[in-house]
Regions:
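Conserved ABC ATPase "signature" region
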Residues: 97, 101, 111-129
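Helix-to-loop junction immediately C-terminal to a conserved catalytic motif
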Residues: 49
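Conserved ABC transporter NBD signature motif
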Residues: 57-73
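Catalytic Walker B motif of ABC-type/P-loop ATPase nucleotide-binding domains
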Residues: 158-162
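A short, flexible loop at the N-terminus of ABC-type nucleotide-binding domains that lies
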Residues: 1-22, 27, 55
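Q-loop/switch helix immediately C-terminal to the Walker
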Residues: 83, 89-105
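Conserved ABC ATPase signature
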Residues: 133-138
Length: 210
């Protein structure tokens, strides 16, 4: 199992400190990251995923007691966020194939082995949109594409930043179903949100407002 230990993290912008002396660990299940808008939820997710630098502190990812190589870690994660965009002119399937190719995806690295690969377009209920240009999709459909592409990498660690954004009631039910399945599978999950219903899906919550 892959595990996180964050020690004394600090991040600030010119005139505003988001968090400081922040320490926590996460080994299994779903860790919710809560807080008001602007509290640093999204920034913290990016920092622990090595997508943004921290100003101070240490971030340790280990697997079976051994430090995880950053390149291996990059291949082991999936990341879903509102600001992630894909190529408008490419189809959903072309975007999925392109992302996997450009990321150097190797299913034999840290990611879980799958005897029977999952059709994530079908799992996220957008199989019929596979040949549609991304730009023709609604915002809710685009959010499902983001989920499908992140999950197609079969990640050991999944970061979800406001995953229910732009989703209708059925889409939010899908999030709940996916999180339940991924938790059972052993995927390490991080969910940043200020939606109480989304946070109810978490095993424990790190509140940046306190």
């Amino acid at each position: 199992m892959i595990e996180l230990k964050a020690v004394q993290l600090r991040k600030q912008y010119t005139h505003r400190r988001l968090f400081s002396e922040l320490s926590f660990e996460h080994r299994s299940g779903v860790l919710g990251i809560a807080g008001a808008n602007g509290s640093g939820k999204s920034t913290l997710l990016r920092c622990i995923a090595f997508l943004q630098s921290i100003d101070a502190g240490e971030i340790h990812w280990t697997q079976e007691g051994n430090a995880v190589d950053r390149e291996d870690f990059r291949q082991a994660i999936g990341f879903v966020a509102p600001n992630i965009q894909f190529y408008d002119e490419l189809t959903v399937q072309e975007n999925m194939d392109f992302v996997k190719k450009m990321s150097g995806f190797d299913p034999h690295k840290i990611s879980h082995n799958q005897a029977h690969p999952v059709d994530w377009l079908a799992k996220t209920q957008i199989k019929d949109l596979a040949e549609y240009p991304y730009q023709r999709l609604s915002t809710g459909q685009q959010q499902r594409v983001k989920l499908a592409i992140a999950l197609s990498r079969n990640p050991s660690v999944l970061f979800l930043d406001e995953p229910g954004a732009n989703l209708d009631a059925l889409g939010k039910d899908l999030i709940k179903e996916l999180l339940t399945d991924l938790r059972k599978k052993g995927t390490l999950l991080f969910l940043a949100s200020n939606d109480p219903k989304e946070l109810d899906l978490c095993d424990r919550i790190l509140d940046l407002d306190h």
